[in-house]
Amino acid sequence: MKVIVGLGNPGREYENTRHNVGWWLIDTLKERWHFEPWRKDGDAVSTTGLVGTKKVKLVKPQTYMNLSGSVLRPYLKREGWTAAQDLMVLVDEVAVPVGEYRLRAAGSPGGHNGLKSIEAHLKSPTYPRLRVGIKPVDERRQIGDLADFVLHTMPRDERALVDDITPRMIDAIELWIAEGTEKAVSSMGR
């Protein structure tokens, strides 16, 4: 089973913040794939369905960002399940301009507390992550304090840029599900 974790913070006050782009994307996947409603699942809400012939579970941690890794505990005990092949994390990335994304098979958390928590639970940096850019393209918009920046509502023009790349991100995720990490990552260069 493939597990896709969308990182974000619970609560209405965080719904439209930059830090919740992982939730925006996972909600879009749920709708596109016609999965059932979210259900309580430990420290998360989740839903499961088929994408093609592959069983996929979508997971939204209900902890705050720095505790997100706790949702992985049940999968770490599954025979044959490996994070390198069966997990993808959807996350905001301040080093990538808004309107762009990066798909990597492994990497560092880059100061992201959600990824730090994931890696602490996995005891490994080797798992696919799709980093959705949140860095402003308008140089007049300064990042300043990082925590303040990621927890502020994303302006409409930037949200539109994320919406514009969502179909391409979904294509990359569907390729990962069907053909694996290497194929999905290599398709990014085309």
UniProtKB/Swiss-Prot annotation:
TRNA binds at residues 14, 64, 66, 113. One of its GO terms (cellular component) is cytoplasm. The keyword GTP-binding does not apply. It is found in: Cytoplasm. Its EC number is 3.1.1.29. It is an enzyme of class 3 (hydrolase). GO terms for biological process: protein quality control for misfolded or incompletely synthesized proteins; rescue of stalled ribosome. The record marks 92 as: Stabilizes the basic form of H active site to accept a proton. The record marks 9 as: Discriminates between blocked and unblocked aminoacyl-tRNA. The keyword RNA-binding applies. GO terms for molecular function: peptidyl-tRNA hydrolase activity; tRNA binding. Pfam families: Pept_tRNA_hydro. Keywords: Cytoplasm, Hydrolase, RNA-binding, tRNA-binding. It catalyses: an N-acyl-L-alpha-aminoacyl-tRNA + H2O = an N-acyl-L-amino acid + a tRNA + H(+). Its main location: cytoplasm. It comes from the Bacteria. Monomer. Belongs to the PTH family. Hydrolyzes ribosome-free peptidyl-tRNAs (with 1 or more amino acids incorporated), which drop off the ribosome during protein synthesis, or as a result of ribosome stalling. Catalyzes the release of premature peptidyl moieties from peptidyl-tRNA molecules trapped in stalled 50S ribosomal subunits, and thus maintains levels of free tRNAs and 50S ribosomes. This is Peptidyl-tRNA hydrolase. The lineage of its organism: Bacteria, Pseudomonadati, Gemmatimonadota, Gemmatimonadia, Gemmatimonadales. The gene is pth.
